[in-house]
Amino acid sequence: MSKVKCRYCKEKIDKENAFSPREKLYFCDQECYRKWRKTDDGQLDALLDYVWHLYSPSKQTSSTYVMIKKQAEHYHNVEGFKYQGMFLAVRYYVEILERLWCDDYGLGQVFPTYYIALQHMYEEQKALKEKLKTTTKSKDKVAIGSHNIIRRKGLSLE
């Protein structure tokens, strides 16, 4: 029996009993895998895996993988971007905006433009949620007629 090391807790486990979401990635169980996905290494892995599948099969080489990883680490270490934020920005670019992925530009076609735009959207959404918590619900019932608005409870429009 061969032994492998859990990526999260670093315990040695039997390869046959290990949880493996994909080739050469082993964990004690699904709980270790979930915890690992929340770490920087796990989030970087998710980003690299997602971006890797955006490239055309002819461009999926080891040098392309290294280039993607270096770009991601640069944006993380130098620019201060978070891996989870980068992952969401790439998904936003591809799935929501439906932009075509250009193999020649790599992550540079998404960062920093869309990362910063998403960051602002998130901050606005967070501020709106906070504002909603502080506002109270109005008890006035409003019925919309064909030509005008009728407020019940005897309220005037003045």
Functional labels for PLM-detected ranges:
Residues 1-46:
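N-terminal cysteine/histidine-rich coordination modules
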Residues 23, 67, 109, 113:
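Short, well-structured alpha-helical interface segments that form or flank functional binding sites
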Residues 1-4, 8, 134-158:
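Short, Lys/Arg-enriched, disordered terminal segments
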Residues 85-146:
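Short, cationic/aromatic linear interface patches
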